[in-house]
């Protein structure tokens, strides 16, 4: 497949192709402009893949610009986290990192230009009065009594704002557009407000800060952005984007294009709701593996490649829709099935004793690291007469559909011997504590010599060599597809979104590193936890199961 055939197509790429063909642009320059007031989530990953992916495919540039115009909510911690997430996803920004605060001097100058043109004024209505005067979708707004101040008075008052002469909330700079506009965003929007807060880049130089809609378009123009890509909620804001650029002296006028945001089943993306999950301790932090944050997905074991593939599959449209969680899970499942080495771990262990195996002895069994990739090599796994198997892999009685170990019948131990269940021991409550078996010594990784068929295969871990491991069985955070539609979204949290088990793993897992996934054979995909795992305590997170159990449950 050629590069052109492999490249995804969508309405934005069609616009870019037309712009390049017509000569409107000779190159492509995009940007990813997050506000550093929180952690990125899977929805941001879509925007990252779109903006950086377009720049890559068209041999253009993509800037990373922090929209840092509200010092009260922003922090350098979020700046560092966002940079890390972008790089982890496999992208690199063009040149230095940009900050909207880099342009505060120019933005101030453009605000003064609008005042001089009679297109901006200092308003002393309170924030509550501004909201009241703005009107509604069905009723026009009304002019502020301060709207018709002279240019000279507005210049003096704006300078008073800049030098700290007003208290917060006592004055702001507004654009003079049309209070009767059918678009509320055009009803004299606020351009500057007062905030006496130290900024993580500019310190205490400024006490007035520009609003997003004023900053965004000018920053795009100053950076030479050719295609400014936003989600659909900014569609009406495009009118203000164009109005600002049309009314200041700036040589470049980028165009804004909107695409649908990512909505994903069984989770929430609202920053307010995610923050509530964290602050009320329904999860263990922003990087909790149940969270839709990039840091949470990474800790759970998602790969950057799987997230990029997911963003590619869902595409870019103008239609709002909700993506099935199964689609995201399918991407990581396919990635790890192809690339994750195999290992054996027993999550719900019960002891199995092979009574005719030489007592006190052990041997090494060779196992492939991947059944379909010999180039991934093999490993030596110890085998002995006492092993752990999963409790679900044994029944005293079962029908023919049960292909595991049954009393009086045989099963194969993965890459080892055929065994037969002979008897069990139970505790006072009737729970099986030990399964006693015999083995066929002539069946190591081969069929029985007499031709009898043994269909079932189960995994195991040698008891004498087993590593105690904690296994965190993560699942979907919510029990319904659209938790945001619930009257109280916290009431539909899945009570089994985290189940912690104490099990055993094969010795090779001692070399596991955070972020490197394994397929625990017959169980699912797991990775070492980056927070709780230590040299003395191995903790593994379930990334995803071998199959979609939610689809079966919903049938």
Swiss-Prot record:
One of its GO terms (biological process) is glutamyl-tRNA aminoacylation. Gene3D superfamilies: Glutamyl-trna Synthetase, Domain 2 (1.10.1160.10), Glutamyl-tRNA Synthetase, Domain 3 (3.90.800.10), HUPs (3.40.50.620), Ribosomal Protein L25, Chain P (2.40.240.10). Keywords: Aminoacyl-tRNA synthetase, ATP-binding, Cytoplasm, Ligase, Nucleotide-binding, Protein biosynthesis. ATP binds at residues 35-37, 41-47, 231, 261-262, 269-271. It catalyses: tRNA(Gln) + L-glutamine + ATP = L-glutaminyl-tRNA(Gln) + AMP + diphosphate. It comes from the Bacteria. It is an enzyme of class 6 (ligase). InterPro entries: aa-tRNA-synth_I_CS (IPR001412), Gln-tRNA-synth (IPR004514), Gln/Glu-tRNA_Ligase (IPR050132), Gln_tRNA_ligase_bac (IPR022861), Glu/Gln-tRNA-synth (IPR000924), Glu/Gln-tRNA-synth_Ib_cat-dom (IPR020058), Glu/Gln-tRNA-synth_Ib_codon-bd (IPR020059), Glu_tRNA_lig_a-bdl (IPR020061). L-glutamine binds at residues 67, 212. Residues 317-324 are annotated as: Interaction with tRNA. A motif ('KMSKS' region) lies at residues 268-272. One of its GO terms (molecular function) is glutamine-tRNA ligase activity. SUPFAM superfamilies: Nucleotidylyl transferase, Ribosomal protein L25-like. Its EC number is 6.1.1.18. Monomer. This is Glutamine--tRNA ligase. It comes from Salmonella schwarzengrund (strain CVM19633). The lineage of its organism: Bacteria, Pseudomonadati, Pseudomonadota, Gammaproteobacteria, Enterobacterales.
């Amino acid at each position: 497949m050629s590069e052109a055939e492999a490249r995804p197509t969508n309405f934005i790429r069609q616009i870019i192709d037309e712009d390049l063909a017509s000569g409107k642009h000779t190159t492509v320059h995009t940007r990813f402009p997050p506000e550093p007031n929180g952690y990125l989530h899977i929805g941001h990953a879509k925007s990252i893949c779109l903006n950086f992916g377009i720049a890559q495919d068209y041999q253009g540039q993509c800037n990373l610009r922090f929209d840092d115009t509200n010092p009260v909510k922003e922090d350098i911690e979020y700046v560092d986290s966002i940079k890390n997430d972008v790089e982890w996803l496999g992208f690199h920004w063009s040149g230095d990192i940009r900050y909207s605060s880099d342009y505060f001097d120019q933005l101030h100058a453009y605000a003064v230009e609008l005042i001089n043109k009679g297109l901006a004024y200092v308003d002393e209505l309170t924030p509550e009065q501004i909201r009241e005067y703005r009107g509604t979708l069905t009723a026009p707004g009304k002019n502020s009594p301060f709207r018709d101040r002279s240019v000279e008075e507005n210049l003096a008052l704006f300078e008073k704002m800049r030098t700290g002469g007003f208290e917060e909330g006592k004055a702001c700079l507004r654009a003079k557009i049309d209070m009767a506009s059918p678009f509320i965003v055009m009803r004299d929007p606020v351009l500057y407000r007062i905030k006496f807060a130290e900024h993580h880049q500019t310190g205490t130089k400024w006490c007035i800060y520009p609003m997003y809609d004023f900053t965004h378009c000018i920053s795009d123009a100053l950076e030479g952005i050719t295609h400014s890509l936003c989600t659909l909620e900014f569609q009406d804001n495009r009118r203000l984007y164009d109005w600002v650029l049309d009314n200041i002296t700036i040589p470049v006028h980028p165009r804004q294009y909107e695409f649908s945001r990512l909505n994903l089943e069984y989770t929430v993306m609202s920053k307010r709701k995610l923050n509530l999950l964290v602050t009320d301790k329904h999860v263990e932090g922003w990087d909790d593996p149940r969270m839709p944050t990039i840091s949470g997905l990474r800790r759970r074991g998602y790969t950057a490649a799987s997230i990029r593939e997911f963003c590619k599959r869902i595409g870019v449209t103008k239609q709002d829709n909700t993506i099935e969680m199964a689609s995201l899970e399918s991407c990581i499942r396919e990635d790890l099935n192809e690339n994750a080495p195999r290992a054996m771990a027993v999550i719900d262990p019960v002891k199995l004793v092979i009574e005719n195996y030489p007592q006190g002895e052990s041997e090494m069994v060779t196992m492939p690291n991947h059944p379909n990739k010999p180039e991934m090599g093999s490993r030596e796994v110890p085998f002995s007469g006492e092993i752990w198997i999963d409790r679900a892999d044994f029944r005293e009685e079962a029908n023919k559909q049960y292909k595991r170990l049954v009393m009086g019948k045989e099963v194969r131990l993965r890459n080892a011997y055929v065994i037969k269940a002979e008897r069990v021991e139970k505790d006072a409550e009737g729970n099986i504590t030990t399964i006693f078996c015999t083995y066929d010594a002539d069946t190591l990784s081969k069929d029985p010599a007499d031709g009898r068929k043994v269909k079932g295969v189960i995994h195991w871990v040698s008891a004498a060599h087993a590593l105690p491991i904690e296994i965190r069985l993560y699942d979907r955070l919510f029990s319904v597809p659209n938790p945001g539609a619930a009257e109280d979204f916290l009431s539909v949290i899945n009570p089994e979104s985290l189940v912690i088990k104490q099990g055993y793993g094969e010795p090779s897992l001692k070399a596991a590193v955070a972020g490197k996934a394994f397929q625990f054979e017959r169980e699912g995909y797991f990775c070492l936890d980056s927070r709780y795992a230590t040299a003395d305590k191995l903790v593994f997170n379930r990334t995803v199961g071998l199959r979609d159990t939610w689809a079966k449950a919903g049938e």
